[in-house]
Amino acid sequence: MDNQNIRIRLKAYDHRVLDNSTKEIVNTAKRTGARVRGPIPLPTHIERFTVNRSPHVDKKSREQFEIRTHRRLLDIVEPTPQTVDALMKLDLAAGVDVEIKL
């Protein structure tokens, strides 16, 4: 593939699973002869929810919950056809959202 980059964005709620998947992608790409830029940690998106503790009274008593979405960015520079085949066959952990752009 001539002068193309593959940009991979990974998202997960658990940063350990995300880092393991990132390492797996980097090792696969390097093994097949491609250069890798990254992993670049992107800002963590924190979504907070505030709810009343009681269903009836006591508005002042509240509880807060949050969901943290961790993100990583990888650029694979000058991928070979073997790199693309290996990445297509790669089986990543459940819970990791992968978005690929050419």
Swiss-Prot record:
Gene3D superfamilies associated with the record: Ribosomal protein S10 domain (3.30.70.600)
Alphabetical list of SUPFAM superfamilies matching this protein: Ribosomal protein S10
Any one GO molecular function term: tRNA binding
Statement: the UniProt record of this protein carries the keyword Cell wall biogenesis/degradation: no
Pfam families recorded: Ribosomal_S10 (PF00338)
Segments passing through the bilayer: none
Superkingdom classification of source: Bacteria
GO annotation, cellular component aspect: ribonucleoprotein complex; ribosome
Role this protein plays: Involved in the binding of tRNA to the ribosomes.
PANTHER family: 30S RIBOSOMAL PROTEIN S10 FAMILY MEMBER
Assembly, per entry: Part of the 30S ribosomal subunit.
Family label: Belongs to the universal ribosomal protein uS10 family.
Protein name per its UniProtKB record: Small ribosomal subunit protein uS10
